[in-house]
Amino acid sequence: MGREFDALFDEWSRSYDQTVTGHDAEYEEVFYQYDKILDAVRDRATGFVVEFGPGTGNLTGKLLEKGLKIIGIEPSANMRKIAQKKHPDVKIIDGDFLNFHVQEKADTFASTYAFHHLTDEEKRAAISLFHTRLKAGGKIVFADTVFETEEAKQEMIKEAKARGFCRLAEDLETEYYTTIPALSSIFEENGFDVSFRKMNRFVWLMDAKMKGA
């Protein structure tokens, strides 16, 4: 899954918590209402949760507060160390959306700010895999940067460049940010009913339930 980004996140691990709390002007709007976004994912998660890309463990903490059983799947070694230090009682293992070794089927797959590391074809493969690894009635609850149309994405890139936000513009151009229609098709094709809720200018909450549940 986009393991080409591992080195970037190993480096970012040192300042990630400062970025998400609004201390980086370029990413301030991306992480606007970050805490509420995490709360929205937590509120929809139930039962045994497999969390992809826990990073420094911020969503993990909220899931723990709710009393949920969690396993974290994190490809960045440095991020794993930080998350494990914050939450020593949580199992956080190496892996990614397409490669994870969890014996028990999950009630919820949860993730924030990570699904865009996969190409659309990889996203399709991941959602197909998730359908086989969820319990009956299971769900996927993700929050990530998504765009309503490809044109909206290009406009956001132009705006970032005009504001001198070179890192943000490069991020939007090089990672695999997709559109709501593309994601809707992927979920529907793989047996999920999905809804989208806009959380800020960049991030949407995706709540997908297995059909027939």
Model-derived regions, located:
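A short glycine-rich, Lys/Arg-flanked "PGG" loop and its adjoining helix->strand segment in the class I
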Residues: 124-136
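Conserved class I S-adenosyl-L-methionine
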Residues: 1-44
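Conserved acidic residues
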Residues: 47, 107
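Short catalytic micro-motifs in class I SAM-dependent methyltransferases
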Residues: 113-114
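C-terminal alpha-helical "lid/dimerization" subdomain adjacent to the S-adenosyl-L-methionine
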Residues: 143-190, 196-197
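A conserved beta-strand element that flanks and buttresses the S-adenosyl-L-methionine
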Residues: 110
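Class I SAM-dependent methyltransferase SAM/SAH-binding core
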Residues: 52-99
